[in-house]
Amino acid sequence: MSDALPMSPAEFEQALRAKGAYYHIHHPYHVAMYQGRATREQIQGWVANRFYYQVNIPMKDAAILANCPDREVRREWIQRLLDHDGAPGEDGGIEAWLRLGQAVGLDPDQLRSQELVLPGVRFAVDAYVNFARRASWQEAASSSLTELFAPQIHQSRLDSWPQHYPWIDPAGYEYFRTRLGQARRDVEHGLAITLQHYTTRAGQERMLEILQFKLDILWSMLDAMSMAYELNRPPYHSVTQERVWHKGITL
């Protein structure tokens, strides 16, 4: 494969976009949510577990910044940190997600405690952050290109959730509305880095594997939630109904 001619930028972008067939919008858990078939517990479980992803995204982006010697890239990439953590004196995406939690009936302190985060979700998110720390900054930046498909998933929630789940406070949808514009902006930057960096066929094939790795992470998170909230088989379900799994080990 490494001896093959490289794809043109247009062909490479098309190959990247084709990976959208495996985006987690197609996972049965997501399909149930936007078709109105999810229970209150399933939506709350998704919000609680996804919060762990939200609070780790700034750490992923900080790792990219730490590994990146390109000042101009850093100047633009740092906006992602501000989007989630918030600028001084301002709320960011993390606070918006906490408000989403309140909107679906979760206590913010319980969300912050991460006591509801399933081990499978924690392992998947931790793998993503660890990849960003160890990979080259270009590879870590390119792994964010699941954002190519993100506007569609945010819009699907805005279109369907108010109709199917009137018990959710509409104020909680702020995060999805905000991310619509942010994700489109981030895609432009991430795609430009990717198309510029991967100019050999071997490099392009590696990038497609990296994007698949990120897709695997998102899909695996939902697999863990399906086990817990759809099949009623959370960790250790055969021996206890208690949430005995670890709540995060600080090193």
From Swiss-Prot:
<comment type="similarity">
    <text>Belongs to the PqqC family.</text>
</comment>
<dbReference type="Pfam" id="PF03070">
    <property type="entry name" value="TENA_THI-4"/>
</dbReference>
<keyword id="KW-0884">PQQ biosynthesis</keyword>
<comment type="pathway">
    <text>Cofactor biosynthesis; pyrroloquinoline quinone biosynthesis.</text>
</comment>
<dbReference type="GO" id="GO:0033732">
    <property type="term" value="F:pyrroloquinoline-quinone synthase activity"/>
</dbReference>
<keyword id="KW-0560">Oxidoreductase</keyword>
<dbReference type="GO" id="GO:0006790">
    <property type="term" value="P:sulfur compound metabolic process"/>
</dbReference>
<dbReference type="InterPro" id="IPR004305">
    <property type="entry name" value="Thiaminase-2/PQQC"/>
</dbReference>
<comment type="function">
    <text>Ring cyclization and eight-electron oxidation of 3a-(2-amino-2-carboxyethyl)-4,5-dioxo-4,5,6,7,8,9-hexahydroquinoline-7,9-dicarboxylic-acid to PQQ.</text>
</comment>
<protein>
    <recommendedName>
        <fullName>Pyrroloquinoline-quinone synthase</fullName>
        <ecNumber>1.3.3.11</ecNumber>
    </recommendedName>
</protein>
<dbReference type="InterPro" id="IPR039068">
    <property type="entry name" value="PqqC-like"/>
</dbReference>
<dbReference type="InterPro" id="IPR016084">
    <property type="entry name" value="Haem_Oase-like_multi-hlx"/>
</dbReference>
<dbReference type="GO" id="GO:0018189">
    <property type="term" value="P:pyrroloquinoline quinone biosynthetic process"/>
</dbReference>
<dbReference type="InterPro" id="IPR011845">
    <property type="entry name" value="PqqC"/>
</dbReference>
